């Protein structure tokens, strides 16, 4: 089967690559991805995005996930910025309205993790958490990009809500980490730190504040990003030079994901740009050296998805529901735009 998240990320990747580098081959693939995604994954009856289809386009799983909705908005908004395609913007705006109408939780606000095909609430959620940091991170990410191409006041208010939510509800300043899983009333359910999500959220909050052009918010998110990045470097860096995946309770894994290393590099460059401290560039060099030595497949290309205690898991697929060009392309785009 083919996933809505994977295909939305493919759409974003080739659109961003074309917008940044101008290669016509990227444009061709971006346009092909846009057409396929709109024709195949948009639920024209119930609104939203299908989770899974088979290779013939037949729907396999029509459940609605906030996560898939946000990546669809993200990919379509990027395609509009890259090409000026009105259909992409209109579809992204339509999905935004669906998410606001059907995905928001009315009592305590925020966005519920998942729904049935026709947007009915579920009796059970993954990790028993109706609200997650990860889903809201990608709402923040998608709304930031959508606001760059559609200056709607309602969208602006929802983006401001997302920034405030992360800074004052999801973030735990005593630990300098973001909580991950929540009940409906925003009580944290699990004691767990995800270092890749932490550092990614830090720099994405900075981008949201800059997009909102709010100087006070820019200063606040800059400081938060520095605090989070510093904490993750102190607690999450292994002695072999990679950012570990997570800590559950007092136990740290020895697992390194490809995307966690990427987000660490971006976060450290962002922290260096904010602070001017070369300490962050030294961390970039440490992680990037590990990546080149252990995570890049020098024979067949691309990156290995995972390493365990420094050794790559070579049998893991390079393309899957959760494995795509999005993080690696974004690394190239961010480094080019930040360092050119």
How would you label these PLM feature ranges?
Residues 1-340:
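Glycan-recognition and catalytic cores of secretory/periplasmic carbohydrate-active enzymes
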């Amino acid at each position: 089967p083919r996933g809505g998240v994977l295909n939305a990320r493919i759409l974003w990747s080739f659109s961003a690559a074309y917008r940044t580098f101008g290669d016509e081959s990227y444009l061709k693939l971006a346009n092909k991805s846009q057409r396929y995604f709109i024709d195949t994954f948009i639920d024209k009856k119930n609104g939203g995005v299908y989770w899974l289809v088979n290779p013939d386009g037949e729907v396999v799983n029509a459940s609605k996930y906030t996560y898939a909705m946000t990546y669809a908005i993200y990919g379509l908004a990027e395609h509009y910025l890259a090409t000026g395609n009105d259909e992409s913007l209109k579809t992204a705006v339509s999905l935004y309205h669906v998410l606001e109408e059907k995905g928001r939780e009315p009592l305590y606000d925020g966005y519920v993790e998942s729904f049935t095909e026709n947007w009915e609430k579920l009796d059970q959620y993954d990790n028993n958490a109706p609200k997650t940091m990860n889903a809201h991170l990608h709402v923040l990410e998608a709304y930031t990009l959508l606001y760059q191409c559609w200056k709607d006041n309602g969208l602006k208010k929802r983006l401001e809500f997302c920034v405030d939510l992360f800074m004052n509800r999801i973030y735990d300043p005593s630990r300098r980490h973001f909580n991950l899983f929540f009940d409906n009333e925003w009580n944290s359910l699990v004691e767990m730190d995800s270092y890749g999500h932490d550092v990614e959220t830090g720099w994405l909050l900075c981008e949201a504040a800059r997009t909102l052009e709010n100087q006070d918010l820019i200063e606040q998110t800059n400081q938060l990003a520095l605090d989070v990045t510093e904490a993750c470097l102190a607690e999450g860096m292994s002695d072999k030079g990679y950012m570990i995946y997570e800590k559950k309770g007092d136990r740290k894994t020895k697992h390194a994901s490809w995307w966690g290393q990427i987000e660490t590099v971006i976060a450290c460059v962002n922290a260096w740009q904010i602070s001017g401290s070369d300490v962050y560039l030294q961390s970039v060099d440490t992680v990037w050296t590990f990546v080149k030595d252990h995570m890049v497949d020098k024979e067949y290309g691309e990156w290995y998805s995972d390493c365990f205690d420094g050794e790559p898991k070579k049998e893991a697929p390079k393309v899957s529901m959760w494995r795509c060009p999005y993080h690696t392309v974004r690394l190239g785009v961010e480094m080019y735009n930040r360092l050119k």
